[in-house]
Regions:
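Surface-exposed extracellular loop regions of Gram-negative outer-membrane beta-barrel proteins
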Residues: 158-178, 217, 221, 235, 453-455, 485-531, 551-569, 684-699, ...
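Face-selective signature of the C-terminal outer-membrane beta-barrel domain
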Residues: 248-272, 297-458, 482, 486, ...
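Short, acidic, small-residue-rich periplasmic hinge/interaction motif at the N-terminus
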Residues: 27-73, 93-95, 101-105, 140-143
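Outer-membrane beta-barrel signature, preferentially recognizing the C-terminal barrel domain
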Residues: 419-425, 468, 497-546, 553, ...
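Outer membrane beta-barrel strand-and-loop segments of large Gram-negative receptors
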Residues: 237, 369-373, 415-419, 519-521, ...
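Short acidic/polar hinge/loop motifs at secondary-structure boundaries
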Residues: 80, 86, 114-141
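N-terminal periplasmic accessory domains that precede
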Residues: 37, 80-83, 122-124, 139, ...
Length: 755
């Protein structure tokens, strides 16, 4: 106490479990003696102390939201897909389609790295994976220059429950893990996890197998078409079952070479398939079909997919404070898939205006990518940070689609309906990003450049080969102001791009439906989007609140559009013919009402406007969705959870999807010092079946699809936890904001929402 004021001073000290202490001290003249205080422990009974505060379940900054899945009681019973319904700015509709801020154009990362298998089959993977295997979910709506520019609505980063390379000095041989089994009326699931540390080595492994069996799915499709012969009506009714097994495994190793260097390696494999056996009934009348006819045919669809990935990262801290670093990374991805469809017509007669033939379609795709990256972060001092780096991606995609006519039980290749082609893509990128934190203000300014070299080669039709290369300059920036230690305000601007996928580019024509043609467009261009977001965050021990206002604009959006051709065939393809403007208000509220009751609201209201001037299409409308949740501590140490999800009609360029409602309830009880966990879950779509209606219309057609899902779910699960520690062996805390770890952002005073 060197710079004190002469006189008497009152010092009040309050320590948990220690009685408040007030000391009166006389500061004598010309003395530098330390003030000595003795804390007097009061006979305070801790049983009378109640601490009511937020769980650290959500962290929000200007450009990123992190949902801590492991702090959510529903993680013990829900799948990852179910959990996403509770995550701010993420929507899951009745057909399990996932969108971020209303858009399906987002990138999926796993542990901070792009994962192509998750990207290609995200809905199927998410509804098979238990939420207990996920540590947290990042919704990065305004990615900085350090992130890839792809994904017009941002990045969804899934962080799994495994260990990182930095070791803990107080844990020389620690480990923990769990084994879980789940049974439901929709399938079974088994998963296991183990992670730990031995000296400087950290490790983790996880595996999961799930089997889902959905029956009594019903689809009715009604299509009206205007033809030169008048109006025609086509109706398809089908009821079928769907089987979906899925398996997943992941292994990681980390080693601390010294106090400044770490190396991490990981490998993962996954796979699954879906089988559908159907007997659709088709009815036709009017126009070229005259008085009408109907027939039943057999359709058998078998779709298989798998993925394998491996990565290695080396990080070197450049100073003792761990604020400057060099990171070198490599990532490999391999993703083959195969889709087979048999279409068999038996005893069909009286058909006019159609040519029906037995067909077998066999389509195989292979995707391989290699990624190398170098990132340099420099602490410039006085709250300034410079980040720069470079990246190279090499992608090789191959598609072999073959159509066979089935003649006398033999498969005869149809050359006109078959296609083999390769898509080669190389991306070179570089970025620089400057960050400043000064008193109550923070700012980020970044610039990224990506140059793409792409070529498509056809094996049988070399005259169709083409090559193109293009560059994209992608700016981003943000500014934030800390209003109080518990609230902040931020404004961000982000430009994003979306390259067309192989399924959108593939010109192969699917002719398995005699009334329709489905194909891609190899001339699609990269999509550019612009986003401006104003966000406000507020936190108190019992209440946390986030609200954001966003506006998106896309001038050349890839639209999946339909039309009827001169042969009366219903065509579905893609084109850069769309312009869209969307304005969103997202809100998240979490309130600890009492020591045993917590309420949550996650909601979104949006207005969208879509145009395709060349096609003469224009649509607009309001939409909203919300999830209201209740967490309750019940007697006998039982944790209960209730949730209701509701969604209004969702619009697009050519129509809409109807709204839906969904109810979820769960109970969880732990035994033997949290070693054993028993959970039960019930999910109900407010009726025996979840009903979804999809409507789209053009100049010469209208199409209505009615889908019915039996989504009532009753599930029981048992989980056994083991190990000699509850530690999470994460990287040591640093002042650097690393995209690959959990370090807290310096610019956000409410970065760690909770304790």
């Amino acid at each position: 106490m060197k710079n004190y004021i002469k006189g008497k001073h009152a010092l009040a000290i309050s320590i948990l479990a220690v009685a408040p202490l007030t000391a009166l001290a006389q500061a004598p003249v010309n003395t530098t003696d330390s003030l000595k205080l003795q804390a007097i422990h009061d006979s305070l009974d801790l049983q009378g102390v109640e601490v009511v505060a937020q769980k650290p379940i959500v962290r929000m900054t200007t450009d990123k939201m992190t949902y801590n899945v492991q702090q959510d009681a529903d993680a013990k019973t829900m799948t990852l897909l179910d959990m996403l319904r509770k995550v701010p700015m993420v929507t899951v509709d009745g057909q399990d389609n996932v969108t971020v801020k209303g858009s399906a154009s987002f990138k999926v990362y796993v542990d901070g790295k792009p994962n192509q298998m998750f990207q290609n089959n995200f809905s199927q993977v998410a509804k098979s994976m238990p939420a207990s295997m996920v540590k947290s979910i990042d919704v990065i709506t305004s990615p900085g220059a350090k992130y890839d520019a792809e994904g017009t609505s941002g990045v969804l980063n899934i962080k799994l429950m495994h260990q990182n390379g930095q070791s803990n000095s107080d844990c020389s041989n620690c480990y923990n893990g769990n084994v879980e089994l789940s049974l439901s009326n929709k399938g079974e699931r088994a998963n296991a996890y183990i992670g730990g540390q031995h000296g400087k080595l950290t490790y983790s492994a996880m595996g999961m197998f799930a089997w889902q069996d959905f029956g009594n799915l019903k689809v009715t499709n009604t299509r009206l078409q205007q033809t030169s012969l008048g109006e025609s009506l086509q109706t398809t009714d089908v009821e079928f079952k769907q089987k979906h097994p899925f398996s997943f495994g992941n292994f990681t190793l980390g080693y601390a070479l010294d106090s400044l260097s770490t190396i991490n390696v990981s490998a993962g494999v996954n796979g699954g398939y879906t089988n559908q056996n159907m007997q659709p009934r088709n009815s036709f009348s009017g126009g070229p079909y005259g008085n009408g006819f109907s027939y039943v045919y057999n359709s058998n669809q078998r779709n298989r997919f798998m993925g394998a990935n491996a990565s290695a990262d080396y990080q070197r801290w450049l100073n003792a404070d761990h604020t400057s670093s060099l990171t070198l990374s490599y990532l490999f991805d391999y993703n083959p898939a195969r889709n087979r469809t048999w279409t068999i017509y038996n005893n069909v007669s009286g058909v006019t205006g159609l040519t029906l033939s037995n067909l077998f379609s066999d389509s195989r795709t292979w995707g391989t990518s290699h990624t190398g990256q170098a990132d340099l972060t420099l602490d410039l001092g006085k709250g300034q940070t410079l980040e720069t780096g470079t990246k190279f991606i090499s992608r090789r995609n191959k598609s072999d689609s073959r159509l066979y006519d089935i003649v006398d039980c033999n498969d005869v290749l149809n050359d006109a309906g078959s296609m083999l082609y390769r898509n080669l893509q190389s991306i070179v990128a570089g970025y620089a990003q400057y960050k400043l934190t000064k008193e109550k203000y923070n700012a980020r300014l970044g610039l990224r450049y990506e140059h793409t070299f792409e070529s498509v080669k056809y094996a049988e039709h070399s005259d169709r080969n083409f090559h193109k290369d293009y560059g994209n300059l992608v700016p981003s920036g943000s500014i934030g102001y800390n209003i109080t230690p518990m609230s902040n305000l931020g404004l961000t601007y982000t430009m994003r791009i979306s390259r067309p996928g192989i399924s959108q580019l593939n010109p192969y024509t699917d002719r398995t439906d005699p009334t329709a043609l489905t194909y891609g467009n190899p001339s699609l261009a990269v999509v550019k989007s612009h986003n401006v977001t104003l966000a406000y965050n507020f936190f108190m021990p019992k209440v946390m609140f986030n609200v954001s206002l966003s506006h998106d604009y896309i001038g050349n959006e890839i639209e999946n559009y339909q039309f009827v051709d001169a042969d009366n065939k219903y065509n579905s393809t893609y084109a850069n013919n769309g312009k869209s403007r969307n304005t969103y208000v997202d809100a998240f509220i979490r309130w600890v009402a009492t020591k045993s009751t917590t309420l949550m609201l996650n909601g979104n209201v949006a207005y969208g406007d879509w145009k395709a001037k060349e096609l003469g299409y224009h649509n607009w409308g309001w939409s909203a969705n919300s999830y209201i949740g209740l967490e309750q501590q019940l007697p006998w140490k039982v944790k209960g959870s209730l949730g209701v999800f509701a969604q209004t009609r969702q619009y697009n360029l050519m129509g809409y999807n109807s709204g839906m409602q969904f109810f979820n309830a769960s109970l969880t009880r732990s035994f033997f010092k949290d070693r054993l966990e028993l959970s039960a879950r019930y999910a109900n779509p407010m009726r025996s079946h979840l009903i979804i209606n999809q409507y789209n219309a053009g100049k010469d057609f209208s199409n209505l699809t009615h889908v019915s899902f039996p989504l009532q779910v009753i599930a029981l699960s048992v989980k056994w936890n083991f190990g000699n520690t509850k530690k999470q062996f994460g990287q040591r805390q640093s002042k650097i904001n690393n995209d690959f770890n959990d370090s807290q952002k310096k610019e956000s005073p409410v970065g760690n929402m909770g304790m």
